[in-house]
Amino acid sequence: MQYTPKFQAMADAAQAKAEGIEPSSVNERIANGAIALDIRDPDEHAKSHIEGSLNISRGKLEMIVEDKIPDLETEILCYCNANNRGALSAASLKDMGYVNAKYVAGGLNAYKAL
């Protein structure tokens, strides 16, 4: 998908702000208490997702995340299909005080390619 320059600049800034983690570390992190957060729309989540992941679509994230994940110390692994929405979500969560919000580098596509 071709993105507008302004959107891509925002996504690049988000990737610089939030840590991107390797897809190969996702399962171990989940086993150690991290939450995989699928920020894609529910129809995308229904088709394929990381097993055990929580689904909060990007458009509702900031409105409901505190009810779903009240602990600001929780490691949260945001993901979309690739990078941008995951990184934007992780950066937004960091702004909200979630100190361990990260994104899965390469998103679900990279995770499934393992």
Where are these regions (language model features)?
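Rhodanese-like catalytic fold shared by cysteine-dependent sulfurtransferases
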Residues: 1-35, 42-75, 81-114
